[in-house]
Structure formats: structure tokens, C-alpha cells
Amino acid sequence: MNVDPLLRRVETTAVSRQLSERRLEAEERKLATGTSTSFFVFQAQRDLAQARNNELLAVIDYRRSIVDLDTVQEAPLR
């Protein structure tokens, strides 16, 4: 069982979340200066929520795979 792809998914989704956070911060700054609208801020908030959800799901999948791997490695041979 190879967990490396799942670890890469965790790393990738973490980067995506960070970029979504930056985008939201930028939209909020633009809104404060009058160069954006609440619609674009809402979109950035929605995208950040989705990115956080994707990251959480990736972490859960990775941790489950680690538990499964440990279980398989500790199982007695027949």
C-alpha cells in the first residue's frame, strides 16, 4: 500500500487553501478601497470554504490509509 500519493494530495490541497486565503484577503482589501464588490468577496469566501473542506478530506483520507497500512502490517500471517 502506497500512501505517497495521498500525502502529495494533502500538500497540494494545503497550498490551494493558502492561495484561497490570499485571494480572499486581496478581495477584502479591494472592497475596502472600492475596487471590488461584495459579490467577489463572497465568491472568495466560498472558494476558501471549499479549499478548507478539500484539505480536510485529504487529511482524513491520508490518516485512514496510515491506519489501514498499520493494520495490514500488524495482521498475523496465515
Annotated model-derived regions:
Residues 1-54, 61-72:
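Amphipathic alpha-helical coiled-coil segments
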